[in-house]
Amino acid sequence: MARYLGPKLKLSRREGTDLFLKSGVRAIDTKCKIEQAPGQHGARKPRLSDYGVQLREKQKVRRIYGVLERQFRNYYKEAARLKGNTGENLLALLEGRLDNVVYRMGFGATRAEARQLVSHKAIMVNGRVVNIASYQVSPNDVVSIREKAKKQSRVKAALELAEQREKPTWLEVDAGKMEGTYKRKPERSDLSADINEHLIVELYSK
């Protein structure tokens, strides 16, 4: 399955919620009618079965983190093997992706932009360049912008934008040095209440 390259707002309208695929310079409800389905007049959303609700939740989370279907299923399998709550383990694995950590630290305005920084070798982990977006960041790892990439206007713009967002408590960021520390894995209470991971577990448990 190829990565989706179409209109980002269309995906948010399909899921009926902001997937944070755009930079956030303007509120998403000023860009499109988020409550309406895609299409000129917004097709009426059908009443979903239990399976349909579970599938939509999985698609929503997968799109938020920019993960392909096969990758997402593999994350679920790994989450199920780990001790503890499978749903919470799944979210922790997704949050631990390098592209997501770069976004959370404010170095990228969106996860897609953060992923691009990683693939363009602009990101270092503990002083070494890592260009794999799915790389799992571990507690106490230091993530930083390479010296030659610090002058990029998009990085500076992203950091300014990040000042308007709530700062994650599991990260410690020095915006001046353009580096941050992944202090710990986020707990469920740290993350969005708009995600219902239990529906995803129910979907894959069938």
Swiss-Prot record:
Alphabetic keyword roster: Antibiotic resistance, Ribonucleoprotein, Ribosomal protein, RNA-binding, rRNA-binding
Residue ranges constituting the S4 RNA-binding domain according to the UniProt record: 96-156
Source taxon at top rank: Bacteria
GO cellular component term, pick one: small ribosomal subunit
CDD domains per the UniProt record, alphabetical: S4 (cd00165)
Any Pfam family hit: S4
InterPro entries: Ribosomal_uS4, Ribosomal_uS4_bac-type, Ribosomal_uS4_CS, Ribosomal_uS4_N, S4_RNA-bd, S4_RNA-bd_sf
Gene Ontology MF terms in the entry: rRNA binding; structural constituent of ribosome
Gene3D superfamilies attached to this UniProt entry: Ribosomal Protein S4 Delta 41, Chain A, domain 1, RNA-binding S4 domain
Effect of K206N: In JB221; fast-growing suppressor of streptomycin resistant mutant S12 K42N. A RAM mutant
Mutation effect (I200N): Confers streptomycin independence on streptomycin-dependent S12 mutant P91D. A RAM mutant
Gene Ontology biological process terms, A to Z: response to antibiotic; ribosomal small subunit biogenesis; translation
Quaternary structure note: Part of the 30S ribosomal subunit. Contacts protein S5. The interaction surface between S4 and S5 is involved in control of translational fidelity.
UniProt function note: One of the primary rRNA binding proteins, it binds directly to 16S rRNA where it nucleates assembly of the body of the 30S subunit.
Family: Belongs to the universal ribosomal protein uS4 family.
Family matches, as PANTHER family: 30S 40S RIBOSOMAL PROTEIN, SMALL RIBOSOMAL SUBUNIT PROTEIN US4M
Name of the protein described by the UniProt record: Small ribosomal subunit protein uS4
Gene source species: Salmonella typhimurium (strain LT2 / SGSC1412 / ATCC 700720)
